[in-house]
Amino acid sequence: MSIDKSYCGFIAIVGRPNVGKSTLLNKLLGQKISITSRKAQTTRHRIVGIHTEGAYQAIYVDTPGLHMEEKRAINRLMNKAASSSIGDVELVIFVVEGTRWTPDDEMVLNKLRDGKAPVILAVNKVDNVQEKADLLPHLQFLASQMNFLDIVPISAETGLNVDTIAAIVRKHLPEATHHFPEDYITDRSQRFMASEIIREKLMRFLGAELPYSVTVEIERFVSNERGGYDINGLILVEREGQKKMVIGNKGAKIKTIGIEARKDMQEMFEAPVHLELWVKVKSGWADDERALRSLGYVDDL
Protein backbone atom coordinates (compact mmCIF):
# COMPACT_ATOMS: atom_id res chain seq x y z
CA MET A 1 0.00 0.00 0.00
CA SER A 2 1.55 3.31 -1.05
CA ILE A 3 1.52 6.22 1.34
CA ASP A 4 0.93 9.56 -0.36
CA LYS A 5 3.83 11.96 0.00
CA SER A 6 3.25 15.36 1.54
CA TYR A 7 5.34 18.52 1.27
CA CYS A 8 5.60 21.37 3.72
CA GLY A 9 7.92 24.29 4.36
CA PHE A 10 8.36 27.86 5.59
CA ILE A 11 8.81 30.78 3.22
CA ALA A 12 9.85 34.26 4.35
CA ILE A 13 8.63 37.30 2.44
CA VAL A 14 11.21 40.06 2.95
CA GLY A 15 11.97 43.52 1.64
CA ARG A 16 12.17 47.14 2.68
CA PRO A 17 8.98 48.83 3.90
CA ASN A 18 6.16 49.47 1.46
CA VAL A 19 7.25 47.34 -1.50
CA GLY A 20 4.06 45.24 -1.43
CA LYS A 21 4.97 42.26 0.77
CA SER A 22 1.60 42.09 2.52
CA THR A 23 -0.31 42.50 -0.75
CA LEU A 24 1.71 39.61 -2.21
CA LEU A 25 0.99 37.41 0.82
CA ASN A 26 -2.73 38.16 0.58
CA LYS A 27 -2.70 37.28 -3.14
CA LEU A 28 -0.77 34.03 -2.55
CA LEU A 29 -3.33 33.02 0.07
CA GLY A 30 -6.32 34.20 -1.93
CA GLN A 31 -7.59 36.27 0.97
CA LYS A 32 -6.72 39.09 3.30
CA ILE A 33 -4.57 38.14 6.29
CA SER A 34 -1.89 40.80 6.46
CA ILE A 35 -2.93 44.41 6.72
CA THR A 36 -2.02 46.60 3.78
CA SER A 37 -1.75 50.36 3.65
CA ARG A 38 0.22 52.87 1.63
CA LYS A 39 2.20 53.85 4.72
CA ALA A 40 5.55 52.22 5.46
CA GLN A 41 5.83 50.03 8.58
CA THR A 42 2.29 48.68 8.45
CA THR A 43 3.16 45.09 9.31
CA ARG A 44 4.42 44.87 12.87
CA HIS A 45 4.06 41.19 13.63
CA ARG A 46 5.27 38.14 11.79
CA ILE A 47 1.98 36.96 10.39
CA VAL A 48 1.94 33.39 9.29
CA GLY A 49 -0.25 32.69 6.29
CA ILE A 50 -0.85 29.07 5.37
CA HIS A 51 -1.71 27.84 1.90
CA THR A 52 -2.55 24.16 1.52
CA GLU A 53 -3.22 22.66 -1.87
CA GLY A 54 -3.42 18.89 -2.02
CA ALA A 55 -0.08 17.46 -0.89
CA TYR A 56 1.57 20.88 -0.63
CA GLN A 57 1.49 23.19 2.38
CA ALA A 58 3.33 26.50 2.13
CA ILE A 59 3.67 28.48 5.36
CA TYR A 60 4.40 32.14 4.71
CA VAL A 61 6.10 34.43 7.19
CA ASP A 62 5.30 38.05 6.47
CA THR A 63 8.10 40.14 7.92
CA PRO A 64 8.02 43.81 8.83
CA GLY A 65 10.07 45.78 6.30
CA LEU A 66 13.74 45.77 7.17
CA HIS A 67 14.89 49.38 7.25
CA MET A 68 17.87 51.48 8.17
CA GLU A 69 16.53 53.68 10.95
CA GLU A 70 16.77 51.94 14.29
CA LYS A 71 15.94 54.96 16.43
CA ARG A 72 12.84 53.90 18.28
CA ALA A 73 12.41 50.74 20.29
CA ILE A 74 9.50 49.66 18.10
CA ASN A 75 11.66 49.94 14.96
CA ARG A 76 14.49 47.99 16.61
CA LEU A 77 12.10 45.18 17.52
CA MET A 78 10.57 45.18 14.05
CA ASN A 79 14.00 44.88 12.45
CA LYS A 80 14.91 42.02 14.79
CA ALA A 81 11.68 40.18 13.95
CA ALA A 82 12.38 40.60 10.23
CA SER A 83 15.97 39.39 10.51
CA SER A 84 15.10 36.38 12.65
CA SER A 85 12.49 35.16 10.19
CA ILE A 86 15.09 34.97 7.42
CA GLY A 87 17.10 32.46 9.43
CA ASP A 88 14.87 29.41 9.66
CA VAL A 89 13.07 29.03 6.34
CA GLU A 90 13.28 26.83 3.24
CA LEU A 91 12.89 29.69 0.82
CA VAL A 92 12.94 33.48 0.78
CA ILE A 93 10.89 35.76 -1.47
CA PHE A 94 12.72 39.08 -1.69
CA VAL A 95 10.31 41.78 -2.87
CA VAL A 96 11.65 44.93 -4.55
CA GLU A 97 9.78 47.73 -6.25
CA GLY A 98 9.87 48.33 -10.02
CA THR A 99 13.07 50.05 -11.10
CA ARG A 100 13.74 51.58 -7.66
CA TRP A 101 16.81 50.44 -5.72
CA THR A 102 17.58 52.03 -2.35
CA PRO A 103 20.13 51.62 0.48
CA ASP A 104 17.39 49.74 2.37
CA ASP A 105 17.14 47.21 -0.50
CA GLU A 106 20.92 46.89 -0.36
CA MET A 107 20.76 46.20 3.38
CA VAL A 108 18.17 43.43 2.93
CA LEU A 109 20.26 41.94 0.13
CA ASN A 110 23.35 41.85 2.36
CA LYS A 111 21.38 39.92 5.00
CA LEU A 112 20.19 37.47 2.33
CA ARG A 113 23.69 36.91 0.95
CA ASP A 114 24.68 35.60 4.38
CA GLY A 115 21.73 33.21 4.54
CA LYS A 116 21.51 29.61 3.39
CA ALA A 117 18.00 29.61 1.92
CA PRO A 118 17.53 30.08 -1.84
CA VAL A 119 16.03 33.44 -2.78
CA ILE A 120 13.33 34.25 -5.35
CA LEU A 121 13.48 37.89 -6.41
CA ALA A 122 9.97 39.29 -6.95
CA VAL A 123 10.14 42.60 -8.82
CA ASN A 124 6.81 44.11 -7.84
CA LYS A 125 4.75 46.96 -9.31
CA VAL A 126 6.15 46.39 -12.82
CA ASP A 127 2.80 47.59 -14.16
CA ASN A 128 3.61 51.03 -12.66
CA VAL A 129 6.98 51.41 -14.40
CA GLN A 130 6.54 54.36 -16.78
CA GLU A 131 9.62 53.74 -18.93
CA LYS A 132 9.35 50.08 -19.90
CA ALA A 133 12.77 50.36 -21.63
CA ASP A 134 14.33 50.85 -18.17
CA LEU A 135 13.02 47.53 -16.91
CA LEU A 136 15.33 45.11 -18.72
CA PRO A 137 18.63 46.84 -17.77
CA HIS A 138 17.35 47.07 -14.19
CA LEU A 139 16.51 43.33 -14.13
CA GLN A 140 20.03 42.64 -15.46
CA PHE A 141 21.47 44.82 -12.70
CA LEU A 142 19.43 42.89 -10.10
CA ALA A 143 20.50 39.54 -11.55
CA SER A 144 24.14 40.52 -11.04
CA GLN A 145 23.62 41.25 -7.32
CA MET A 146 23.41 37.64 -6.16
CA ASN A 147 22.65 34.18 -7.43
CA PHE A 148 18.85 34.27 -7.25
CA LEU A 149 16.87 31.07 -7.66
CA ASP A 150 14.61 32.99 -10.05
CA ILE A 151 13.69 36.57 -10.92
CA VAL A 152 9.97 37.14 -11.47
CA PRO A 153 8.44 40.50 -12.48
CA ILE A 154 5.06 40.70 -10.74
CA SER A 155 2.17 42.93 -9.81
CA ALA A 156 0.93 41.82 -6.39
CA GLU A 157 -1.95 44.27 -6.78
CA THR A 158 -3.35 42.76 -10.01
CA GLY A 159 -2.03 39.23 -9.42
CA LEU A 160 0.28 39.27 -12.47
CA ASN A 161 2.73 36.31 -12.23
CA VAL A 162 1.81 35.57 -8.61
CA ASP A 163 0.92 32.04 -9.76
CA THR A 164 4.50 31.72 -11.09
CA ILE A 165 5.82 32.51 -7.59
CA ALA A 166 3.41 29.97 -6.07
CA ALA A 167 4.59 27.29 -8.54
CA ILE A 168 8.27 27.91 -7.70
CA VAL A 169 7.42 27.73 -3.99
CA ARG A 170 5.63 24.38 -4.44
CA LYS A 171 8.59 22.98 -6.34
CA HIS A 172 10.94 23.80 -3.45
CA LEU A 173 8.87 22.53 -0.53
CA PRO A 174 10.67 19.65 1.20
CA GLU A 175 8.95 16.35 1.80
CA ALA A 176 7.42 16.70 5.27
CA THR A 177 4.17 16.25 7.11
CA HIS A 178 1.84 19.24 7.18
CA HIS A 179 2.13 21.46 10.26
CA PHE A 180 -1.45 22.72 10.09
CA PRO A 181 -4.90 21.33 9.22
CA GLU A 182 -5.73 22.04 5.59
CA ASP A 183 -8.44 24.60 6.35
CA TYR A 184 -6.06 26.80 8.38
CA ILE A 185 -5.15 30.10 6.75
CA THR A 186 -3.28 31.67 9.66
CA ASP A 187 -2.07 30.55 13.07
CA ARG A 188 -2.89 33.92 14.60
CA SER A 189 -5.84 34.11 16.96
CA GLN A 190 -9.09 35.86 16.07
CA ARG A 191 -8.29 38.37 18.82
CA PHE A 192 -5.03 39.24 17.06
CA MET A 193 -6.75 39.51 13.67
CA ALA A 194 -9.36 41.84 15.22
CA SER A 195 -6.63 44.17 16.49
CA GLU A 196 -4.95 44.15 13.05
CA ILE A 197 -8.22 45.07 11.32
CA ILE A 198 -8.77 48.02 13.68
CA ARG A 199 -5.18 49.14 13.12
CA GLU A 200 -5.63 49.00 9.36
CA LYS A 201 -8.69 51.25 9.59
CA LEU A 202 -6.82 53.69 11.83
CA MET A 203 -4.09 53.92 9.21
CA ARG A 204 -6.58 54.34 6.41
CA PHE A 205 -8.61 57.12 8.00
CA LEU A 206 -5.95 59.11 9.83
CA GLY A 207 -3.24 61.50 8.72
CA ALA A 208 0.33 60.59 7.90
CA GLU A 209 1.74 61.46 11.32
CA LEU A 210 -0.45 59.41 13.60
CA PRO A 211 -0.37 55.67 12.89
CA TYR A 212 3.07 54.72 14.14
CA SER A 213 2.28 56.01 17.57
CA VAL A 214 -0.93 54.03 17.72
CA THR A 215 -1.54 50.49 18.83
CA VAL A 216 -4.63 48.45 19.55
CA GLU A 217 -5.36 46.13 22.45
CA ILE A 218 -8.39 43.85 22.40
CA GLU A 219 -9.66 43.96 25.98
CA ARG A 220 -12.66 41.73 25.44
CA PHE A 221 -13.43 39.12 22.82
CA VAL A 222 -16.33 36.86 23.77
CA SER A 223 -19.02 34.85 22.02
CA ASN A 224 -22.55 36.08 22.65
CA GLU A 225 -25.88 34.24 22.69
CA ARG A 226 -26.71 35.59 19.22
CA GLY A 227 -24.00 33.42 17.68
CA GLY A 228 -21.67 36.37 17.19
CA TYR A 229 -18.90 38.16 19.08
CA ASP A 230 -18.72 41.09 21.47
CA ILE A 231 -15.39 42.83 20.96
CA ASN A 232 -13.98 45.77 22.92
CA GLY A 233 -10.94 47.47 21.40
CA LEU A 234 -8.68 49.91 23.20
CA ILE A 235 -6.76 52.31 20.94
CA LEU A 236 -3.57 53.55 22.61
CA VAL A 237 -2.01 56.83 21.48
CA GLU A 238 0.96 58.78 22.81
CA ARG A 239 -0.51 62.27 23.18
CA GLU A 240 -3.79 63.99 24.02
CA GLY A 241 -3.78 65.71 20.60
CA GLN A 242 -3.66 62.32 18.89
CA LYS A 243 -6.61 61.15 20.97
CA LYS A 244 -8.67 64.09 19.64
CA MET A 245 -7.54 63.20 16.12
CA VAL A 246 -8.70 59.58 16.47
CA ILE A 247 -12.06 60.55 17.95
CA GLY A 248 -12.66 63.30 15.36
CA ASN A 249 -15.29 66.02 15.34
CA LYS A 250 -18.18 64.89 17.58
CA GLY A 251 -16.84 61.33 17.41
CA ALA A 252 -17.23 61.10 13.62
CA LYS A 253 -13.77 59.62 12.93
CA ILE A 254 -13.89 56.83 15.48
CA LYS A 255 -17.42 56.00 14.37
CA THR A 256 -16.23 55.51 10.76
CA ILE A 257 -13.26 53.42 11.93
CA GLY A 258 -15.60 51.26 14.03
CA ILE A 259 -18.12 50.73 11.22
CA GLU A 260 -15.45 49.78 8.67
CA ALA A 261 -13.58 47.50 11.12
CA ARG A 262 -16.81 45.74 12.08
CA LYS A 263 -17.61 45.01 8.41
CA ASP A 264 -14.20 43.39 7.87
CA MET A 265 -14.43 41.39 11.11
CA GLN A 266 -17.86 40.04 10.21
CA GLU A 267 -16.51 38.94 6.85
CA MET A 268 -13.44 37.32 8.38
CA PHE A 269 -15.19 35.63 11.33
CA GLU A 270 -18.35 34.82 9.34
CA ALA A 271 -20.49 35.94 12.29
CA PRO A 272 -22.18 39.12 13.56
CA VAL A 273 -19.86 41.40 15.53
CA HIS A 274 -20.71 44.00 18.17
CA LEU A 275 -17.65 46.26 18.36
CA GLU A 276 -16.91 49.01 20.87
CA LEU A 277 -13.82 51.22 20.67
CA TRP A 278 -12.14 53.45 23.28
CA VAL A 279 -9.14 55.74 22.95
CA LYS A 280 -6.60 56.13 25.75
CA VAL A 281 -3.35 58.09 26.06
CA LYS A 282 -0.34 56.01 27.08
CA SER A 283 2.66 58.23 26.50
CA GLY A 284 5.97 56.95 25.18
CA TRP A 285 4.85 53.39 24.41
CA ALA A 286 6.74 53.21 21.13
CA ASP A 287 10.01 53.93 22.95
CA ASP A 288 9.58 51.52 25.83
CA GLU A 289 10.65 47.97 25.00
CA ARG A 290 8.92 46.56 28.08
CA ALA A 291 5.60 48.14 27.15
CA LEU A 292 6.02 46.87 23.59
CA ARG A 293 6.58 43.33 24.76
CA SER A 294 3.44 43.48 26.88
CA LEU A 295 1.49 44.59 23.78
CA GLY A 296 2.71 41.59 21.83
CA TYR A 297 5.64 43.09 19.92
CA VAL A 298 7.99 40.23 20.58
CA ASP A 299 11.24 39.77 18.71
CA ASP A 300 12.00 36.16 19.58
CA LEU A 301 9.09 34.35 17.92
Curated annotation (Swiss-Prot):
The keyword Cell membrane applies. It comes from the Bacteria. GO terms for cellular component: cytosol; plasma membrane. It is found in: Cytoplasm; Cell inner membrane. Residues 206-283 form the KH type-2 domain. Residues 15-22 are annotated as: G1. Keywords: Cell inner membrane, Cell membrane, Cytoplasm, GTP-binding, Membrane, Nucleotide-binding, Ribosome biogenesis, RNA-binding, rRNA-binding. Residues 154-156 are annotated as: G5. PROSITE patterns: G_ERA (PS51713), KH_TYPE_2 (PS50823). Residues 7-175 form the Era-type G domain. The keyword ATP-binding does not apply. One of its GO terms (molecular function) is GTPase activity. GO terms for biological process: ribosomal small subunit assembly. Residues 62-65 are annotated as: G3. Residues 41-45 are annotated as: G2. InterPro entries: G_ERA_dom, GTP-bd, GTPase_Era-like, KH_dom-like_a/b, KH_dom_type_2, KH_sf_prok-type, P-loop_NTPase, Small_GTP-bd. It is a peripheral membrane protein. GTP binds at residues 15-22, 62-66, 124-127. Residues 124-127 are annotated as: G4. Monomer. PANTHER family: GTPASE ERA, GTPASE ERA, MITOCHONDRIAL. Belongs to the TRAFAC class TrmE-Era-EngA-EngB-Septin-like GTPase superfamily. Era GTPase family. HAMAP family: GTPase_Era. An essential GTPase that binds both GDP and GTP, with rapid nucleotide exchange. Plays a role in 16S rRNA processing and 30S ribosomal subunit biogenesis and possibly also in cell cycle regulation and energy metabolism. This is GTPase Era. The gene is era.
